[in-house]
Amino acid sequence: MSTYLRGLKEKAMAELQAQPSIDGKEKPKFMALQQVYEWRRALKDLIPNDRPILSNCVGFVVTLIPAEDLLQKPLSYVASQIRHTLIEQGSREQIEAYTSLIRQDPINRAPPLFGDTSMKLLMFTNWQRARLYETDFSAASVNKLDGPLFPSYIQAVPGPYEFNDGLILFGKDSSGNYWFGGQRAQGQWGMMERKIEEGMKDF
């Protein structure tokens, strides 16, 4: 395991160092695109199939990409880089290496952050496949119901870190509405709302 982790570190450092300065210019700034990834498929032999289990089984995959590429190259390029990351970091060996880093944090058991201190971290997560709004809570209802009882609102409480930039797609409710959540640095949420409104003009 330590050999594998060492190899990943050496590869990451080599890729960062492979961006030389040209004519005295600074090296390009990188962005860290972090997304939630489900581990159940890779770890299915560890999850009992003969009884219920209620537990998170997710981690993060991180795509390091030059900010210049993020701004200037087509969205399809960014998507291909993220797809490559999902394949590479979704392997059983990679997941075991990742969780070994989590266990090194005895207090929070928090996932590690990758990159350097100059990076901008952007977090995105799509929970639609979890079908949270299709969870039936009728068994917990005080009054007897004739049909299912679905949630009307879902809220995420991040921790142990307080991130200042992230978006969550919670999913689609029973009325067909899509719910988003997120956090931005203080004073920047107004700009976020304007951008969302601009993007929704054609819908």
Task: Spell out what each predicted region is.
Residues 1-203:
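Acyl-CoA-dependent O-acyltransferases
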